[in-house]
């Protein structure tokens, strides 16, 4: 029986890194508190996750399903590593991609209202190994909604990879199969994670400041 892969656990008292140690766009400096996960660490961890995914799912056609918008950077980098492994393997498998968008956030609080945008034609998932790629799992309600939708199409297997999982009292207890980092309950931005569409262009995962939320 498959088990969920371990993650890098970042403690509640993790101080992070001073902004001036990294290249941060000037227009964001006042809006950020600290760098929480540097880009290089994200990439190294993503490379390992790709190996875990291929070990678990690499025996059958994979459909990689990206959760937009926040998941696109992690999705692209994870797939690059998976494709590299696939190219250099004695037994390569076909891989296709699809996209879906879920809306559950308003400002820095989860509203509890989840809207599924797209996914009108997910019949291609039938009989396939489906890898859902998400940027962050907060309460877990959003992912549970998506999983119930995907399973209606009778895939052979469904696994979820998320770059981040928050430790929060609001969690419904859901945990993905592949997790990059388990983090404290802080509002983070960067590496395509946004705050009202800002900060997606940051390379690092950073903690937003109160000024940034204003």
From Swiss-Prot:
There is a cross-link at residue 115 (Glycyl lysine isopeptide (Lys-Gly) (interchain with G-Cter in SUMO2)). Pfam families: Pribosyltran. The keyword Cytoplasm applies. CDD domains: PRTases_typeI. GO terms for biological process: GMP catabolic process; GMP salvage; guanine salvage; hypoxanthine metabolic process; hypoxanthine salvage; IMP metabolic process; IMP salvage; positive regulation of dopamine metabolic process. The active site is at residue 138. The modification Phosphothreonine is found at residue 142. GO terms for cellular component: cytoplasm; cytosol. The modification N-acetylalanine is found at residue 2. Its cofactor is Mg(2+). It catalyses: IMP + diphosphate = hypoxanthine + 5-phospho-alpha-D-ribose 1-diphosphate; GMP + diphosphate = guanine + 5-phospho-alpha-D-ribose 1-diphosphate. Pathway: Purine metabolism; IMP biosynthesis via salvage pathway; IMP from hypoxanthine: step 1/1. There is a cross-link at residue 115 (Glycyl lysine isopeptide (Lys-Gly) (interchain with G-Cter in SUMO1)). Mg(2+) binds at residue 194. Gene3D superfamilies: 3.40.50.2020. Belongs to the purine/pyrimidine phosphoribosyltransferase family. This is Hypoxanthine-guanine phosphoribosyltransferase. It comes from Mus spretus (Western Mediterranean mouse). The gene is Hprt1.
